[in-house]
């Protein structure tokens, strides 16, 4: 039996754009995708810290170093520029694989530049 675990997370990214008339997805700076181990076109969950909305979409790689976080299509209705979001990808694995698994957690500043990366997260404690 497989279970689903967090595989990659970009924590408290700042929305830089919202493009309602685009076909869909979230555009994310490729540097952030790589750091979090999230692939282009991978399904992600986006949580808007400002309004509590949680949505699913897929990723599109944005220009490296651009800091872009752009909600596209219908998802653009759920965020405004400057909102803070958490972007999470999940992976299915066996229980044996899960016991050894460590997620990639990426923290960013207000300009979506990486400030810290870790592979461990526990309530009240983050270990690098």
UniProtKB/Swiss-Prot annotation:
One of its GO terms (biological process) is alanine biosynthetic process. The modification Pyruvic acid (Ser) is found at residue 25. One of its GO terms (cellular component) is cytosol. Substrate binds at residues 57, 73-75. Its cofactor is pyruvate. Is synthesized initially as an inactive proenzyme, which is activated by self-cleavage at a specific serine bond to produce a beta-subunit with a hydroxyl group at its C-terminus and an alpha-subunit with a pyruvoyl group at its N-terminus. It holds the Pfam family Asp_decarbox. GO terms for molecular function: aspartate 1-decarboxylase activity. Binds 1 pyruvoyl group covalently per subunit. The keyword Lyase applies. Pathway: Cofactor biosynthesis; (R)-pantothenate biosynthesis; beta-alanine from L-aspartate: step 1/1. It catalyses: L-aspartate + H(+) = beta-alanine + CO2. The active site is at 25 (schiff-base intermediate with substrate), 58 (proton donor). Its main location: cytoplasm. Its EC number is 4.1.1.11. It is found in: Cytoplasm. Keywords: Autocatalytic cleavage, Cytoplasm, Decarboxylase, Lyase, Pantothenate biosynthesis, Pyruvate, Schiff base, Zymogen. Catalyzes the pyruvoyl-dependent decarboxylation of aspartate to produce beta-alanine. Belongs to the PanD family. Heterooctamer of four alpha and four beta subunits. This is Aspartate 1-decarboxylase.
